Amino acid sequence: MATADNLDTPIAKKIDLSKGKLPFKGKGLSGCVDINSKSIEEQRRYGVERLAAAYRIFSGHGFDLGLVGHISFRDPEFKDCFWINPLGYHFSQMKVSDLCLMNQNGELVYGKERTGDSAQSIHSNIYKSRPDINAVAHAHPMYGKTFSTLNKELKPITQDSCAFYKRTATFTDYDGVANGPVSYTHLRAHETRPY
């Protein structure tokens, strides 16, 4: 498995995650200072720190069942690459140093280990089709999976559910795990939904 120390790619040579450290107030995500990043290094560091925090937040809400699920962030400099969790790392333990940078062809560009094929397929296809999107989250939470078996849209019966009314997609033609470009048909519903 390729590691950050032996990856000899032009992109890996340009990335230094020790640069661009951002100021913090207090502790935890609520203490983060939202700044207008001026340098690419600051933008990258800002994104990967929040990505690592997002994994821990998902874990705190129980969205980390087994090895399924992933969250990614499009690199601010290399737009055909995205930061994501490597396969087998638990959300609750995720650190910036654990994240890997993958290109849309499934190649590890920076990091210790690559992500799984399913994550690669889902995230790269969304980023290819939606250049306006800079982050993608995919999870299998208990209640989400349970509700999905009903194959129904969420109804606006509470204030919280109103945020998702007519903004969710259901997939009725499931034909297996999303491991390649053929599975892109599962993701097409996202192209027409107004987010």
Question: Can you describe what each PLM-predicted range is?
Answer:
Residues 123, 183-184:
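Glycine-rich, charged/polar anion/phosphate-binding loops
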Residues 40, 111-115, 169-177:
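Short histidine-centered catalytic/ligand-binding loop motif
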Residues 139:
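Short alpha-helix carrying the canonical HExxH Zn2+-binding catalytic motif
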Residues 142-183:
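Class I SAM-dependent methyltransferase SAM-binding "motif I" and its flanking Rossmann-like core
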Residues 185-192:
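Conserved small/polar residues in nucleotide/adenosyl-binding loops
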Residues 2-38:
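Extreme N-terminal flexible tails
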Residues 41, 48-135, 144-157:
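An anion-binding catalytic pocket shared by soluble metabolic enzymes
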